[in-house]
């Protein structure tokens, strides 16, 4: 966070906006929510001002504003241009990450098949050459395939992301996406890398707390903040229509254990049936 703070007032617009985005997300994990809101506000104001005329610079403004909104599951700014107008103008590595953001946007629209297709196409066309964008692309593919109940494809993408991440310990993305991954971390990472899983979950608790403090007030969507990560992951599946037996099989736990997680979550959230869980879950 301190490394980016000095660039928040940089004269170069691309550097300043990149710093704002990185700084905002670092602040979410650190619990500095007012600082995160200020950085996100600067991003929105820059796009709204429309002062930049250079196409490449304007594309950078649009990308950063797009990423800031989509990754916090917020409405897009009114001034947001179509993605196809700015994606081609971004440098290749950044374009790969922007395709992750676009795929994430399609996921939020429940267009899971097209989102997954975008990921597969991006990876096939060279995005795998950029490790960090590749990790994020594989993770959004997990989100898509779990939404489509294609668990084998989801696991393949998760483990590919894990293979890319492990040499340099790039585990932050896994913690950031935990609740969206359909309990795949519990199913595939926890049994084989338990200590790494614990570190990922520590990131999840810190990041998601800050994320909700920005997301919930703006959207009025009260994403649950009093569940354990396992309860949340199980409830995400239950809210999407997975049966207790399917959840138990996915996590390799007993049906009674799966039912206990759901019952405890319902008690905490004061709801009486599984359908009511959905209002407290991520989209």
Model-based region annotation:
Residues 5-16, 42-56, 81-95, 121-132, ...:
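Solenoid-like repeat scaffolds
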Residues 67, 77, 91-121, 126-134, ...:
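Linker/hinge segments immediately adjacent to helix-turn-helix/homeobox DNA-binding domains
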